[in-house]
């Protein structure tokens, strides 16, 4: 009797695991298909920084533009003006006082940051098995992907990266960056437009 019950429970558990793995694979496939179909993306964003040492949150706002083939413009407009542009292997950092151009191939830190930003906005981090261990779950009307860094340099920066996807569009709606010390940055994407023409000037690095 006990042996039969154990066999039944084992079978039931195996079935649940199998169904979960199938669901996970289907979600990943839908996200990958949506990312591949997204040639451009434009949106507003609200970034909220939660610091363990402070009770007040730091909120900033801005505009993001993405173009498939490694181009990203991340522009803060409030409470300060600051722009980061990624164009393949070049990064431009610009504010009102100065601007700097960085070759990411010669700066490992910026290469990692550029990779995380570029891949997070469309969900491609899910396909980077060498950099992240990831799990995907359905929660309400969204999919939530939790990414745990695997490489040593990534572990020094982040404990987890959590991506929230709309189930309807299979697109990222929110990114959470949990740092090693427990500080958390939440980025919410709003007014998203996809596959509309973006001027090449938006990604100029010089």
Regions found by a protein language model. Name each.
Residues 1-4:
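Positively charged n-region of N-terminal signal peptides that target proteins for export
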Residues 7-15:
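Bacterial N-terminal signal peptides
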Residues 18-20, 25:
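Boundary at the C-terminal end of the N-terminal hydrophobic targeting segment
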Residues 38-40, 59-61, 69, 79, ...:
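Extracytoplasmic
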Residues 45, 72-76, 91-94, 145-147, ...:
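Short hydrophobic/aromatic-rich beta-strand segments that constitute the beta-sheet cores
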Residues 63-115, 185, 191:
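An acidic-aromatic
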Residues 102, 125-206:
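Gly/Pro-enriched, hydrophobic low-complexity segments
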